[in-house]
Amino acid sequence: MAAARSRVVHLLRLLQRAACQCPSHSHTYSQAPGLSPSGKTTDYAFEMAVSTIRYGAGVTKEVGMDLQSMGAKNVCLMTDKNLSQLPPVQTVMDSLVKNGINFKVYDHVRVEPTDTSFMEAIEFAKKGAFDAFLAVGGGSTIDTCKAANLYSSSPDSDFLDYVNAPIGKGKPVTVPLKPLIAVPTTSGTGSETTGVAIFDYEHLKVKTGIASRAIKPTLGLIDPLHTLHMPERVVANSGFDVLCHALESYTALPYHMRSPCPSSPITRPAYQGSNPISDIWAVHALRIVAKYLKRAIRNPDDLEARSNMHLASAFAGIGFGNAGVHLCHGMSYPISGLVKTYKAKDYNVDHPLVPHGLSVVLTSPAVFTFTSQMFPERHLEVAEILGADTRTARRPDAGPVLADTLRKFLFDLDVDDGLAAIGYSKADIPELVKGTLPQERVTKLAPRPQSEEDLSALFEASMKLY
């Protein structure tokens, strides 16, 4: 009891500190809105939108009761071919049958979905006339289910209507959606907590997505028992996604420095910039990653480590789902989208694949060296959490210290030696930069603006890590 009380006090102190200081922890700023919304060029407020989440070993068995309570009569269960034969999906179906819930299974979800795979799932959802959705799988499955729910609830909309600008029209979601329950089986995306759905837009060979609080799951069931089936490299790459979600959201441009100021609350973006509440979740997720990720990768039977990483994924999701991510993710989308022949170990797919978490983390040393010029104290703080000795470090040391800490972390976990190791060369940099430019939804949240030349230099620096 005393330990729990101490933990609460510690978190409250973190919140108090974050609310009183700017992201560099050295200059105070006012929380007052100042001018009216119509008169400001930058935002003055932030929102926290989070799915209801339930955590516990075996909690998946409750899903049938949840859908019964929601009044669901016809449920769309989405998963992928591999997972459809594994215990998580069987546990879900047993619960649905036990509670008299009618359902149809869609198991054609693509790992790293595309606009084509999204539209196939959407068509299935439209024909099924479902009154609730249930996603069992990793981020690809949950994101596909979000899209199916959205477009089947808005059947006359064009696919690009809700896709993020500049690739799509980025229209706000105003139609009511059906309940969606997410049962994550990996520990990385945090998609069970966020209003974001990511996919490859095949025409341009880039990743983009849909971002709206309206599409976040109604309920996320976080069951650590599902993590025990994950292969080593899936655990690793999922964990790298958690790592970068937390690092990027904590070092993102502060919400009150983001522009433009929205003319209405409905136009305030899902990704709003770092803020005092997201900061707490990001820091806590980083501490869990530092303590448990290596254990979770190396020992598949370590339920404590894998359970904590499952929680860290949700914690980081709460943080970045409202604060946002920036350059690591913005640059990762063309890295995944332009993949040539690389096939990651432990992924049972029939197409070339750079897992999302790997594509994100390979640029992290270069990115945080670049961004450390803004808010260096934050960069030193996260380096210390990850194991660096920062007692004699100065502000100008922040970038190199964090970059070296990340390189050591990745080397210890047998991560590929940079972009060159997954099939890229300097000749590919112009296309990688071209694929990053449309990702302004996230790249504009970097604390430091970047030119095309800057992006080229970051990709070049990421060709080799060690």
UniProtKB/Swiss-Prot annotation:
GO molecular function terms listed in the Swiss-Prot or TrEMBL record: alcohol dehydrogenase (NAD+) activity; hydroxyacid-oxoacid transhydrogenase activity; metal ion binding
SUPFAM superfamilies named among the record's database cross-references: Dehydroquinate synthase-like (SSF56796)
Compartment(s) of residence: Mitochondrion
Residue positions where N6-acetyllysine is found in the record: K444
InterPro entries the record matches: ADH_Fe/GldA, ADH_Fe_C, Alcohol_dehydrogenase_Fe, HOT
Catalytic activity: (S)-3-hydroxybutanoate + 2-oxoglutarate = (R)-2-hydroxyglutarate + acetoacetate; 4-hydroxybutanoate + 2-oxoglutarate = (R)-2-hydroxyglutarate + succinate semialdehyde
GO cellular component terms given for this protein: mitochondrion
EC number in record: 1.1.99.24
GO biological process: glutamate catabolic process via 2-hydroxyglutarate; lipid metabolic process
Main subcellular location: mitochondrion
Keywords: Acetylation, Lipid metabolism, Mitochondrion, Oxidoreductase, Phosphoprotein, Transit peptide
Organism domain of life: Eukaryota
Modification sites for Phosphoserine: S451
CDD domains found in the cross-reference section: HOT (cd08190)
Stated role: Catalyzes the cofactor-independent reversible oxidation of gamma-hydroxybutyrate (GHB) to succinic semialdehyde (SSA) coupled to reduction of 2-ketoglutarate (2-KG) to D-2-hydroxyglutarate (D-2-HG). L-3-hydroxybutyrate (L-3-OHB) is also a substrate for HOT when using 2-KG as hydrogen acceptor, resulting in the formation of D-2-HG.
Family from the record: Belongs to the iron-containing alcohol dehydrogenase family. Hydroxyacid-oxoacid transhydrogenase subfamily.
Protein name per UniProt: Hydroxyacid-oxoacid transhydrogenase, mitochondrial
Native source species: Bos taurus
Gene from which this protein is expressed: ADHFE1
